[in-house]
């Protein structure tokens, strides 16, 4: 599936970057990220995919009910292992799902929207790339690591830049 390949490519890029960071850099608050850490952004990426995986069988996904597991944001080796697990969990058939969410902090009850597994994988892929752009900002602040030019950049933007360069 094209989506699985795209997610794999992004996860490989993210894992390779984590390998270059020290544990201290992974957990260092970044002023440019409002004192968030690279690890917190990685945790957020992983947990949204876990919510999708956990919601597959019952057919109901709620990203707001993620665990917010501090170990993911504080242990980069643990996080790297979870990236592999999450990718393996994407090897599933498409099926209809319900997405449950409160889009207003004052809402008393969530709304439910029709969606499907592949659509949610696509959402999570785009969400991951967005957070990788933020991670890029954080890494620039806490380290001297040279990131690939396409790190945190959507594939459509990469294609557009290539067309402009010709």
Positions of PLM-derived features:
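Alpha-helical bundle segments that constitute or directly flank the non-heme di-iron/ferroxidase center
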Residues: 1-23, 39-57
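Amphipathic alpha-helix face/heptad-repeat signature
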Residues: 3-10, 37-38, 75, 79-82, ...
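Structural signal for well-ordered, non-membrane alpha-helices
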Residues: 11, 15-19, 46-50, 84-91, ...
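Short, contiguous alpha-helical
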Residues: 27-65, 110-152, 158
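Helix-adjacent hinge/juxtasegments
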Residues: 59-98
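Carboxylate-rich helix-loop segments that flank metal/cofactor sites and access channels
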Residues: 92-110
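Short, contiguous hydrophobic alpha-helices characteristic of membrane insertion segments
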Residues: 98-100, 154-162
């Amino acid at each position: 599936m094209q989506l699985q390949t795209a997610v794999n490519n992004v996860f490989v890029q993210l894992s390779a970057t984590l390998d270059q960071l020290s544990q201290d850099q992974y957990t260092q608050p970044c002023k440019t990220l409002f004192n968030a850490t690279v690890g917190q952004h990685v945790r957020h990426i992983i947990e949204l995919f876990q919510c999708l995986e956990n919601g597959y069988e019952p057919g109901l996904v709620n990203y707001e009910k993620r665990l917010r597991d501090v170990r993911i944001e504080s242990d980069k080796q643990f996080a790297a292992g979870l990236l592999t697990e999450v990718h393996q969990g994407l090897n599933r058939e498409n099926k209809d799902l319900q997405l449950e969410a409160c889009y207003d902090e004052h809402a008393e009850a969530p709304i439910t929207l029709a969606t499907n597994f592949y659509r949610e994988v696509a959402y999570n892929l785009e969400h991951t790339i967005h957070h990788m752009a933020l991670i890029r900002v954080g890494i620039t602040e806490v380290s001297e690591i040279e990131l690939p030019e396409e790190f945190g950049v959507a594939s459509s933007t990469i294609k557009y830049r290539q067309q402009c360069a010709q």
